[in-house]
Amino acid sequence: MSRRDDLTGKGPMFGNNRSHALNATRRRFNLNLQKVSVVVNGRKVNLKVSAKTAKTLRRKNLI
């Protein structure tokens, strides 16, 4: 299961955890994925989108 936004294609970002001694270990910043249903061509389609994309869809009255 890929952690990717179905509409925008955004995926996780990578960075570092930093301890008090400033040791760096790699980590992932995952998206806040939400399941939403959108009507496309008269059919209901379930998508996994980021919270930001879902907010934009709500603002444009698409969900």
Swiss-Prot record:
InterPro entries per record: Bacterial_rp_bL28, Ribosomal_bL28, Ribosomal_bL28/bL31-like_sf, Ribosomal_bL28_bact-type, Ribosomal_bL28_sf
Annotated SUPFAM superfamilies: L28p-like (SSF143800)
GO MF entries: structural constituent of ribosome
Record-level GO BP terms: translation
Domain of life: Bacteria
Pfam families: Ribosomal_L28
Region (Disordered): 1-21
Gene Ontology cellular-component terms listed: ribonucleoprotein complex; ribosome
Keywords: Ribonucleoprotein, Ribosomal protein
Keyword Ribonucleoprotein part of the UniProt annotation: yes
PANTHER family: 50S RIBOSOMAL PROTEIN L28, LARGE RIBOSOMAL SUBUNIT PROTEIN BL28A
Entry similarity comment: Belongs to the bacterial ribosomal protein bL28 family.
Protein name listed in UniProt: Large ribosomal subunit protein bL28
Species whose genome carries this gene: Mycoplasmopsis pulmonis (strain UAB CTIP)
Gene expressing this chain: rpmB
